[in-house]
């Protein structure tokens, strides 16, 4: 039997009016620099990849098999100063799960030759994982002289503190909204009966800055006995099939040729929420216009103050994590092997984030998400169990992440699209931060008194990622290398996109 046709939609030439959904951390909404799913040479009997395969307008496939290309990056030796020893269990990065980051490029095409670009790439990081980009400087190597009139990070952090009163009001409104939607989705007539509510994102990770005005709520639906079919060797996007779907299942209506359609489920999910918010008392809430490619249904609470809430539908699978994550989550030297094993026994999630190929979207695909693992890591971030507890030593890890997020936020406000900063998302900063934590695992390297130096090290690492255009996804490390191979084999079409 011929494989089912896959729907494809062409990206609109103009964005729709209305407020765009904010970038959701943990990979749950469209990261501006998210690489497209990587096409591969057709194989006998393989499913045709990409929206183009469904519409008949196929993109040109890679001229060379990526497997014939030599290894671009060499594994770096462990730095001699890297201390070793058993790590105490403590509980990253959406994250979640999201495709790896090929960092955004500026609008100019004057980039030099491909060989010179490859020569600039740094060697890989620690042995765990295929490569983590540039080596982050270790705080214990020495302190820089403080410049006259140097900035005061603690004063900035004080300004970023959230008001307890604001937190209380915002949390009450958002929790009431979430509970109301949960009851409706679990009602007898709902196709989503059995969903659970998972609160994720920067607010619940306690790294929210400035104001409690953005929240993420993930509604998870367990789907037992599913089979994943990787989309175009992308490592992050998948078609979802049921190994055995009971007759009369409410999910039958979302099947298309045996594939669980992400677009159909998201459409129905959005429709239910749109109707239900009309019945929420004492809350002025509206739904924002759908953003192409985003898995989130964005609600705007207008009173008592404006709060943006991203509602995400996620499939929950308790099967083993996909093979593409095998070399990801490099936390053994930081949080310990036991913690890593425990985290990898947790479920993984799939969100209706469509794979993108050029200007086309494959609307039946789902994308991996690990936002719950990121939350667990940031909650228990110390190598010792008592790090940042009442009786323990306080570190400055979260403070560094807050400052990095604020730095990017302020630069985007100042320059916006003028310098291409709109292509960056706080998840890029978060991913870089997690790699610095991996390379500098010891709590003694993150003492609160060394905040200035630790933050400087984080910024230095991120700068190196920008200069080399290399930032590896924390959970799916091979995503970036596959995308680069595709670009190299096809004359770097990405240069024409900006």
Swiss-Prot record:
Sequence segments annotated as region (Disordered): 1-150
GO molecular function terms attached to this record: 2',3'-cyclic GMP-AMP synthase activity; ATP binding; chromatin binding; DNA binding; double-stranded DNA binding; GTP binding; metal ion binding; molecular condensate scaffold activity
Top enzyme category: transferase
Catalytic activity of the protein: GTP + ATP = 2',3'-cGAMP + 2 diphosphate; GTP + ATP = pppGp(2'-5')A + diphosphate; pppGp(2'-5')A = 2',3'-cGAMP + diphosphate
Annotated site location: Arginine-anchor: 244
Binding of GTP, residues: 200, 310, 367-374
Biased composition (Basic and acidic residues): 57-81
Annotated protein name in UniProt: Cyclic GMP-AMP synthase
Encoding gene (name): CGAS
